[in-house]
């Protein structure tokens, strides 16, 4: 069986010369739930943008056994449900239905199946009654749910979420936690919300300065006060 995510010795520098990834190696198994933590500028978001080919560095990236080369980019992007930190970066259509339908329609899914996928995705995030609403009139918590629905409609193998709890009030945050707990997909999340990590993610990976500096059971990582302090993370 293939790893859902396999990254080996991944290196990437931005045009200004900043080295954002310095030899990252990471594997994630099917159905595994993994949290990615570290200070701002550690390379977490840069790593995530490599998983569906938005960025291309040096090294090896495979999703469900598919390399990002050799014409596989379309199937890789369908397999990786990338949810940005700011849902307004993901929601651009006149209605919620059109936002959630955009991906499958773009991939050539028949219209009848698209409607079924949209209905299923909206129900999965608790937004079944919102299909005709205007996305930009929703609250931040509602927008984040719709953004997740836009990738669920692609029937991804893995959800990759960048700071999903950022900007949420306590009630919306709790609703998000309950939603993430219920989703069956393999999951990789980047976050500063360590209580969320402790509650939902059995494995935690710590990044700093473009490298993985720790990888192990969440309870062990989050109880290691010297490790947290050394890499700009608040002890719990």
Regions found by a protein language model. Give the residues of each.
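Helix-to-loop junction immediately C-terminal to a conserved catalytic motif
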Residues: 52
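Conserved ABC transporter NBD signature motif
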Residues: 59-68, 76
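Conserved ABC ATPase "signature" region
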Residues: 112-130
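A short, surface-exposed alpha-helical micro-motif characterized by mixed small hydrophobic
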Residues: 197-199
